[in-house]
Structures are given as C-alpha cells and as structure tokens.
C-alpha cells in the first residue's frame, strides 16, 4: 500500500509535494532520484533479512504491487515515468537550461534509475515472491501477535483488545444495517438488505458520469456548495486552497481516495485525490460524505489549519491516526446540519461509509488476530456491505498491508 519508488516517480508530475517550477527545483528532484538506487539496494538487503527470519509479505500484496514496479522499468527514456518532469518543463527556462536538464535526466534514467528499477523488479518477482506467505494476517509472522497488539494501541490510543474491538465491530455492523433497512423500506424493495445495497450501487441514475472530468466537475460543484455553508459552522478557515484531482494512473490500481496536505510555506495547495478507474461506474451517492471526510471540513481543515497556527513543529506536522480520522468522521456527520443528507440517496451513501468503518473493526481484527484468510475477509465485506469483489479485494489488501490503521475510523 504505497511505496517510495512509485511515489518518487509520481513527483515528476510537479503536482505533488515536489515542486517543479524552477531550475533549482529540477536539480533538487534529480538529486532525490539519484538516491533511489541506494534505497533500493538497502530495501533488497532488508527483504532478504526478512526472508531469513520469516518476516515476509503475503503473496497477494506483492502480486498486486508488481505492475507498478514493472512500470518503472520502461526502457524508452522518453516513455519512462521518471521523464515526466522533462515533458512538463516550464517554457520560461532558457534553451540552454532545458537542454542541460534534459541531458542530465536522460543520463540518470539510463545509468541509474532504469538499472535499479529492473533490479528491484527482478528481485521481487524471482527471489522474493516465491518466499512470500500464504497467510494474510500479521500474527502469522514471528512475534506478530504482540506486534499487532502494539499497533492496535498505537492507532486507536485505547487499551481495547483486538477481541473487544472485534465484538464492537459486529455490534456496530448490526446497528447500521438496521438503519439502512429503514431506508430500504421506503423503496419498497423486496429482497435482502445486501441485495438492496447491490441494487442501489448498480442503478444507472447514480452513475451519471462519462469521463474523469465529469467526476472532478461534480466534486467541484460539491466543494462550492459546502464552502458556502462552512462559515455558519466555523469561525476560521484555512488559507491554503484545496484542489481536486484524479489519482494518477500509475497508482490507481492499488490506491484509495486520500488527501495530501499543503506546503507549510503556502507554495502548494491541499489536494483531494479520488480514484476513478472507470467513470461510468463511479457512484455519486457516496461523494458527499467522502468529500466531507477527505476534503473540507475534514482532512483539509485539520491539516491546513494545524500548519497555519503558531504551534511547535511537532504539533504542526504530527499525525495521530485516531485524532485525524476521528475529526474526519466528525466532519462527515456535519452533512446533516448542512442539509446535505436530506436526499435519502445521499444519506444512504453516508450510512454506507459508516458501515464500512464498522466492517473495518471486524475485518482488521479478523485478519490479524483471528487468522482470517484474504478470501474470508472479502466475503464478509461482500455479504455485509454489498460491495463487488474488486472493491473487497482492494480494501482487504489495504488492511493486510497496514495492520491496525483501519481501526482508527470508529
């Protein structure tokens, strides 16, 4: 779930945390890129040590991640993801600087980045993948059970045991499904609640988009609607702007919708990234609650205001999962006060996200403390949330890769 080589390559868009507006920016980015081979060598050394100790990743995580690493091995320099920065070089640079930077990046790709990426891909595919484990949970590795208990405490800041959290999750799943059943009754839909949720997800009226830009434009309208209501609820708003972007293609297959904070010096906005695999299948019923969480007043208000306030650096830039996600969950509930859930379809979308968080309590603890399999976890999601297999797979693999983190959302 994420990784430095792919993230570093994405910086070449100039749209992320690496600015690419000046010649100095380009020189600094190239310095970062040139350090990647050293990092890869150390990562391979660490993974070989993990193989010796029996501390390895589950097989599906490596299988899912290999295509993104494979994309780094493009031999044609001008098609390489590491060449993105050159393709978008500002026209204000002198011809001499453009030529110098192009030559420097080309040489780095040929002599450093491409060989290192091939080395990493070859290692993962031929040496590491055969040693990965069939188990899904972290408790299967040496000292994994103790590690998971620590991660539970780290992410939740509570003293609750995995068993207690699992029981709470089951209780919450039942409660929220009860609320959903009331909405189902209004539709006069005959069938199980899970069947109703599947039907609702697949209704054409809730999938009105044809292009990625259609989705982004809809979020833009939603952003304006919410922004107009926020002064009624908050006396202070962030100075940093918020932008809405589609998740880059390189990471779209493994990413989740997320927020990236602004630069503390104001040089970069906060960004809400949404994953659009197929715009024709993108549902509009979950957009409101998702944007309240990831955008404003959720993560954007929290992160941007935290950086803008006169606080010590450890508080400006620190992140406590339970607090950050807890605030974003609270932000979702403000949709009621703003009248955004008056439409029963949008309210159902809100409940679906609330159900997702309750399901996470069950599935994360199931995976990492009850020896649930990947398939068992996916089936629980499909049975209770009505999600399709690909969505269940993406979520399950996220929890496999990030033990305990999903518990902070409730």
PLM region descriptions:
Residues 1-410:
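N-terminal maturation segment of proteins
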